[in-house]
């Protein structure tokens, strides 16, 4: 079995995902066969990964974070890297994905009772990920200090103690109170869990690190733990795909550029990293529009992203007045792209007679495409190779969706996937819908698409940019963490 080390946080969004990705890349550069692992993730930003030994299945779902971490390791993503994925459908319920496949749906209280049964799947995947690896770097979820959930925990100390994996605690100094967060975690953890922690690190530091020397001494006094380093705010991390929708709350529009792309932040937004390749283009400004704010009138393109609750988000789309903004945008000659759930919303109607996504079984669409969607229980999950109909260029991406879409505008498909038409295009060519995620990740297509909107010189090599960002993050960590000591404590 491979040696392992685990990063757990003093809270959510402390930067564990980027740290694990950077450490994975640093270990890879040392010549180690390294793999990522996250026992349980909660995200509607999913990726399609291989299901080892299942040659007849199109693929399974994992969190995009583990997909990125696998890329950092230089290996193909596997469903075993994230055996339990929770995809929120409401404030109190989520779809449960186990080893890539839909296990069922559970309300928050029911899921707590279910977690004990899921530990077997977690440990099975854990054993598989370690096969042939030298090192596995594990990412926790939330915080081990949530001691009210400890008895059935599979994400943090529940896993670490069962798998005997040493833990490094991550504190986020940017949000304030990091001394209390680290010392408080030490205080309330039971002795069995406290023994698993071999040290800590401070993340997202800004300014002169020497000003925190007394803080480090205070943490050592209260905990006795070793500090592996103080990591600065990593600018390179902004060039990596984002997984957590928390980041959308903090994204400002930035400097004005040649093309403004408006993205309404849906309540159950999914796979919003579809926009990352556009964000990386020097002439493109991507603006995420929060609920209650109008779609900007100077946007040349509106992208409606995926959704885990299409009908619910369609209803809220109208409540925000975005349907009126979108109609005005179209009257001005603006372009619209709908991806997956966003594609379904662009039609005349969405029907869900079996209540697969919720209690509301039907909703009027935005009417920009002459199509209708019927939700069906079987989910499509697969990586795809396709060809753009508009530009006759190759595309690479993936599908994760429920529902079947029909109607006159599907006679003008946006892509051909394995010989089958996908999506729809309006008669004037300015409204495009597709089920294919990753559309903008195809450099040649993205360049031609931007050219059709009047933007010349687009189509940067996005994959190369991601690889460079991973290298830069790893280099920053090497400069501020004792990576040799950290890897040396893995067991």
From Swiss-Prot:
**Any idea what this protein is called?**
Cobyric acid synthase
Gene name of the encoded protein: cobQ
Report the HAMAP family cross-referenced here. Answer: CobQ
Protein biosynthesis keyword on record: no
Top-rank taxon, per record = Bacteria
Q: Which UniProt keywords apply?
A: Cobalamin biosynthesis, Glutamine amidotransferase
Instruction: Please tell me the species this chain comes from.
Output: Mesorhizobium japonicum (strain LMG 29417 / CECT 9101 / MAFF 303099)
Q: Can the keyword Ribosomal protein be found in this entry's annotation?
A: no
Biological or metabolic pathway of the protein: Cofactor biosynthesis; adenosylcobalamin biosynthesis
């Amino acid at each position: 079995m491979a040696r392992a080390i685990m990063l757990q946080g003093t809270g959510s969004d402390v930067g564990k995902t980027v740290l694990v990705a950077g450490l994975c890349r640093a270990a890879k550069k040392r010549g180690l066969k390294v793999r990522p692992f996250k026992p349980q993730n909660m995200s509607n930003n999913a990726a399609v990964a291989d299901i080892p030994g299942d040659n007849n299945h199109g693929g399974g779902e994992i969190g995009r974070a583990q997909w990125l971490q696998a890329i950092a390791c230089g290996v193909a993503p596997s469903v075993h890297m994230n055996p339990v994925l929770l995809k929120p459908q409401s404030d109190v319920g989520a779809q449960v994905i186990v080893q890539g496949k839909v296990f069922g749906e559970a309300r928050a209280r029911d899921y707590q009772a279910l977690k004990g049964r899921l530990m077997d799947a977690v440990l099975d995947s854990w054993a598989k990920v370690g096969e042939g690896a030298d090192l596995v770097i594990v990412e926790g979820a939330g915080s081990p200090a949530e001691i009210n959930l400890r008895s059935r925990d599979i994400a943090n100390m529940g896993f670490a103690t069962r798998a005997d994996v040493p833990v490094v605690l991550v504190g986020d100094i940017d949000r304030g109170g990091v001394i209390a967060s680290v010392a408080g975690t030490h205080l309330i953890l039971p002795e069995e869990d406290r023994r698993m922690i071999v040290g800590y690190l401070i993340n997202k530091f800004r300014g002169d690190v020497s000003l925190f020397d007394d803080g480090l001494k205070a943490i050592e006094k209260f905990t006795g733990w070793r500090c592996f380093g103080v990591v600065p705010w990593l600018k390179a991390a902004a060039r990596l795909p984002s997984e957590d929708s928390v980041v959308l709350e903090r994204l400002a529009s930035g400097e004005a550029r040649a093309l403004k792309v408006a993205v309404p932040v849906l309540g159950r937004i999914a796979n919003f990293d579809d926009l990352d390749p556009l964000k990386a283009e020097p002439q493109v400004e991507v603006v995420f529009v929060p609920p209650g704010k109008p779609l900007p009138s100077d946007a040349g393109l509106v992208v409606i992203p995926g959704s885990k609750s299409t009908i619910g988000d369609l209803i809220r789309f109208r409540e925000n007045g975005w349907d009126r903004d979108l109609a005005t945008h179209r009257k001005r000659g603006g372009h619209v792209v709908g991806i997956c759930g966003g594609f379904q919303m662009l039609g005349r109607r969405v029907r869900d007679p079996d209540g697969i996504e919720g209690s509301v079984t039907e909703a009027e669409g935005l009417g920009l495409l002459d199509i209708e969607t019927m939700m069906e229980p079987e989910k499509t999950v697969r990586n795809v190779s396709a060809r753009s109909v508009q530009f006759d260029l190759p595309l690479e991406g993936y599908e994760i969706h429920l529902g079947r879409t029909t109607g006159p505008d599907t006679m003008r498909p946006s892509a051909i996937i394995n010989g089958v038409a996908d999506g729809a295009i309006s008669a004037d060519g300015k409204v495009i819908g597709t089920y294919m995620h990753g559309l903008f990740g195809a450099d040649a297509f993205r360049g031609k698409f931007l050219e059709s909107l009047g933007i010349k010189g687009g189509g940067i090599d996005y994959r190369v940019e991601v690889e460079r960002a991973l290298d830069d993050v790893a280099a920053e960590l090497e400069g501020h963490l004792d990576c040799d000591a950290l890897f040396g404590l893995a067991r």
